[in-house]
Amino acid sequence: MITRKSVFQLFMAFSLACGGLGAVSVLNAPEAAAANTCGTSYRMVKDGRVPVKDASGERFATIEVSFSSKDNQNCAILVKEGRHWGLEENVNVSIAFSGDQDRQHGQDTDSGRMKEYSRAVYTAKGVAAGDKPIKVSATVGNASASAEGWDGSGNAPRITNPK
């Protein structure tokens, strides 16, 4: 008989066999996990974290909205935490970014099935030049998180153009 415990044990064994990255190590290293999608020059500027719970209040996720300096990508990371998610869930994520008028705007909407203790990284590309902040936001259901950043140098949180 296949149980939740046996499936979880199989999943953990597979995770360890494929590079030794257990679920806990991934959740504790958002920069490293995001770097695979957002590039090695990934740098956290600011993040917004919003718990997402169902009617029972048992399930939750964390939305981490952050910036990448590589390929002008702004990244929104949805992290699923806790065993209450069950083995599989449908997750709908909407990402949008905006800035000044001469900046390229765009939106990327995606959905997928996520395993327990896993994360999904969604990206939206835009031109990272300009003197006004660029904002990236992620929405999951009725919960959302966002962050703003600037290019160039200065005291405010900024993202750096890729070299």
Residue ranges, per PLM feature:
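N-terminal prepro-regions of secreted/extracellular proteins
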Residues: 1-55
